[in-house]
């Protein structure tokens, strides 16, 4: 029952080694890009400073990036995107634990900040759903990605044709993986920076009861403008947004601001030092207060 029950979940093998890392007095920090990574830090920050009870932690990712000269050019690894989007998405609920749904389930329109606007988002398998419930008290944890109807259609077609498979097939005298062929036919996302325009947004939407006892809904987010990241770092927005977070984490570990033993996710560590240092890098985060449902 792949669309109801989980199998081996993301992180299971890593967390199985946690005791060995603890006994060795060493820290294994997992999931420290932007999503997972910064999104988990946002969840920690919301739980520590903004909410007394959390109903849902929902990571929401969207963008308005375009690539000049291409009808279809993903701005992130198509190999990884196929893996994430066609695997059964995982959801966590306090009363059920972890469970799965069909790909692209529960579509919703989420309005992103900085002028990106409304984007259709769907459930996608992602590490935050496996990490956040381990350290943050919530009723529900989800991850939804703003893929858009065209991208979803392409992924569904690849799946129908078997081109998402990693099992080698014979082509003439060669043995090749269909997914590797798809990746080879598309441009390397890291080389698209000078052809890209627009913004990408990673963030964590949190609902529940605020520290004042009133219903509260917020979206903590990080937006990167491709023009800025190219001008400042010579790197396209999606790549830069992913890469800056492990740099921040390494600095915090080196300074002792982040410390621990065992296998830990970012939400197991204090959020404020991370958010402060990220801002010092000239790429601040933001928080939008939103009107709670039914208010």
At which residue positions do the language-model features occur?
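Active-site nucleophile and cofactor-binding loops and adjacent substrate-binding regions
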Residues: 31-36, 238
